[in-house]
Amino acid sequence: MFKELIWVKENSLTEQFCKSVIDKFETDPYRKPGEVDQNNPRIDKDLKVTIDATITHNISWREEDDVLYKALGKGLYEYEIYLQDISLGKWNLHPSDGYRVKDTGYMIQKYEPNGFYNWHHDWCMSEGWSRIYTYIWYMNTVKEEDGGWTEFIDGTKIQPKVGSILLFPATWTYV
């Protein structure tokens, strides 16, 4: 059942959009070494080696933020339909107060060769909401022989393909 909850949809974003995001990111003055722990942000190269830029609330990224918001809404909707299909209606995935999404913003992360983000989970609870899904968009394609992939604790590996979105539960079982 573990693998079934990991879902990839190709062409969630266009290749042209992804290229423009990469180009803009490369010149963004707010890029910085990746930090861990949103409650106590710090650089810890034993846990994460990335270059990050948070684009939400940055006026120069407003158009991209809007595209990502719409694509995420569509992706979440399709993912939940997929989950209902594989569960044969056994799971109720909609919260009792209806389908609401809290947009917590978007961060672009660049992994240089040998960069990584160590095993972790993304579940959190804050201000009356819970994060239940994690999503990753791939802005570029990485060949398997080049060693870039997203790997789960059960050994499942997802190969990055430009424009694809990856969705999975944010809980500890999907580190």
Which residues make up each language-model segment?
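Fe(II)/2-oxoglutarate oxygenase catalytic core
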Residues: 1-166, 171-175
